[in-house]
Regions:
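C-terminal catalytic/motor cores of large multi-domain enzyme assemblies
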Residues: 1-272
């Protein structure tokens, strides 16, 4: 039996089938992973590229490519069962402005596995510009504005009811289509506000199994392939993911593939 956002994974081994019962919550099944990416080839490539793109847009393009190549990391746990998500989607946090009191909003971007880097970057840029528009609310902002007008006890009752319906896979598509907490991963760029990457918890609401945080670009000592030590520009990326969706070896090889795409962005040129 499937859901409107994924299909039940068949042929799951007994241990993996047991994991949701042994670790019923996402935050009880967290794995932390960190990468330091060498940007010595990346930044000149970005500067020379026309039309211009940002490191964040490049990262999203790399993630889209990896998620299309390694489908097991596009799975999620719901109702104690393992599902294969039927789309590649990433949720993005956007601050309306650099003012510390400016509101933060979230948007969900859906991509096609055949998207080129140009397709992905254009999509991300459009969504971020729309989210920054103070005069225009995102779908999630409209929904939250309506719900938060209700009494607290009623909000909690609604959330509990929705989680119960979601457990049985009966939530209608319109309730999850634009919800940022129903996506392949949450991708946050703390580097855009000058901060280092941090580990973030997973949300028990929704079904996101990955949280990915990019830090600021900085200089750091790096040992090259020739064994020589040099100072290069790097970025740290920290991941939090639900180990119940697939094994650690599969996940780590997928994330190392992402490293290859960011450190050698020419690999993303052309169609997948």
């Amino acid at each position: 039996m499937g859901r409107n956002d994924g299909d039940l994974v068949a042929g799951v081994g007994p241990l993996r089938r047991m994991l949701p019962s042994l670790m019923p919550s996402r935050n009880g099944a967290l794995v932390y992973y960190e990468q330091q990416l060498d940007l010595s080839k990346t930044l000149p490539w970005i500067e020379a590229r026309q039309p211009s793109i940002t490191l964040y847009e490049l990262a999203i393009a790399g993630l889209v490519r990896v998620w299309s190549e390694r489908p097991q990391i596009n799975r999620f746990i719901a109702g104690g069962k393992l599902y294969q998500r039927d789309e590649i989607s990433f949720s993005i946090s956007v601050k309306k402005s650099l003012d510390e009191n400016a509101p933060l909003t979230s948007i969900k971007a859906v991509f096609d596995p055949s998207d080129t880097i140009e397709d992905t970057c254009k999509r991300v840029e459009e969504l971020i510009e729309r989210a920054k528009d103070h005069k225009r609310e995102t779908e999630s902002e409209k929904e939250m504005r309506f719900v938060t007008k209700l009494p607290i006890f009623f909000i909690r009752w609604l959330v509990a009811l929705q989680r119960m319906v979601d457990w049985f896979g009966l939530l209608p598509r319109f309730m999850t289509r634009n919800d940022p907490l129903y996506s392949s991963a949450y991708v946050v760029n703390l580097g855009s506000v000058g901060l280092e990457a941090a580990y973030h918890h997973l949300y028990e609401y929704g079904n996101i199994p990955f949280f990915i945080v990019l830090g600021k670009v900085k200089k750091a000592p790096v040992v090259g392939d020739d064994g020589e030590l040099s100072v290069r520009e790097v970025v740290n990326i920290r991941y939090t993911f639900d180990e119940r969706i697939t094994d650690g070896f599969y996940t780590s090889t997928a994330l190392e593939r992402f490293r290859e795409y960011i450190e050698n962005p020419k690999l993303l040129d052309g169609p997948p």
